């Protein structure tokens, strides 16, 4: 799993397009990005699965997320986050 400093450094290259970022250390989710249009991007890590989950939610409707993507390769994680940003701001 990415440690917090590395996580923040790698995320610094992502344009969150006005989203409000919150980072946590040693917790799930690792990061949330809130948007004024009601979208939320949640990035979490499940250790027992060795998998990151990037979930896009609209209007706090966790029962029916807009998209959830499972990622096991850290190098792919940030491209999935970028796709989630585009989905959140484009809708």
Regions found by a protein language model. Give the residues of each.
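Ampiphathic alpha-helical segments that act as solvent-exposed interaction surfaces
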Residues: 64-91
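Intrinsically disordered, low-complexity regulatory segments enriched in Ser/Thr/Pro
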Residues: 41-72
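Negatively charged, low-complexity tracts enriched in Asp/Glu with abundant Ser/Thr
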Residues: 1-38, 63-65
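Residue-identity detector for glutamine
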Residues: 10, 27, 47, 72-75
